[in-house]
Amino acid sequence: MAYTRGTLSFSTEDGNNYSYSKSEPYTSRYLIWSGNYYFILPKSFRLSIAPGINYGHTNYSYIYQTSLQDASGILNSSREDVLQLRGSATLFKKITDRQNAFFRAWYGSTSNDVSYSGTSPYDNDFSDTYAGASLGYNFSDKMWNVSADVALQWEKNKINDLSVEEFYPLINLSAGFSPSKKHSFRTYFHFGANYPGASEKTPNVLQQNELMYYTGNPNLGLSRQVTFNLSYNWMPVNAFSASAFVQYFGEFNLYVPVFNPYNDGKALLRTFETDCDYNRTQIGMSFNYKLLNGNLQLAASPSVSLYRVSGLFDIKRSPFYCNASATYYLGNFYFQASYQTRSLTVQGNRGVIYKDRNFYQMLAGWSRSGWNIRVSAMNLFRKDWLCSTNILSTPLYSETQYVNGNNFHQRLNISVTYTLGYGKKVKRGNEVGEQYGAASAIMK
């Protein structure tokens, strides 16, 4: 359940201040099944089949009340049923000891049935259907590891009686080169596309408060994505290693929120338009150094990110980020001190600048024979509850949102786990996994 309180002060005829409260209670239930079937075939062929089904039901309410005596408030209730079917089949072929190839085909369909009642009643039927096929190749030897796959995907989005469909290519290229044990290079390139979610394409109008209404844009199309990574690793001795990297991510024709006058200029209507090019470049390094026969380990990872957003939002930011840690091992015991600076990111499809807090931690633990006992002291001198700040600025509407929580508040954690040494291999610190259902189409 999400709950928000706020106070808005402005000049009114009677001179009284204004306050509001907002709550968003919801419940979601999911049934999830997924399978993975593996077959060994003649002539060095292998076949992998992965089907899956998700069903979900969500009840969501938006309740808004004000201090005005004559105001009736806002109540929007929604019920959603979502069904997701998906499946893929991959045929692998071993050509030689150094070469492999594969052919993959996939299909998926998600349908969302959403019914709104209350202040803004409406019914919506969404469906997203996609299918595609790809060819891939891999070559590896003592120095090289090269992979490439090319795919063609068809996707169709339908909202009530309006549909949009498109064919688009997907490309993945990667290469690794290790001339010696001390040096290695790796690069990766991806070209793809992304469709907006169903909630961003909702055609109905929902009232949020006296001055704000929300709607989607059924005509939103896909955006193009480009990813490029290049890294270098250097390990002159076992006790020391360093790496340098550059990463680029670009998304073009990206949808962003747009605010327009509504209700004869007495309110604003938030919708979405394709009016953004998003570019993020990150340059960084990392270092690891072992002392005292490996019992003391020092690590640091500084980086700088270059954000450039053009279109409706003209945003330029170049934040610096670094995390560092020192870990000491004494028999079955271990101790760690770590610190990370505040991070800043620019969220392209929201036009929001996100800032969190710096974080520091002292940790002590004991591990033996599957047991892991750990005590962590975090942010011991910070008593406030502020987690992050979200800043949105447009010509007609600006918003600064302060998010509270315990992520950066002073706290003490005690963890005791025991891991059985058979069956599925799990990652320490994440012994219990979590399953997720299909994406919701409810507009919020």
Regions found by a protein language model. Give the residues of each.
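Primarily recognizes Gram-negative and organellar outer-membrane beta-barrels
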Residues: 1-236, 240-365, 374-444
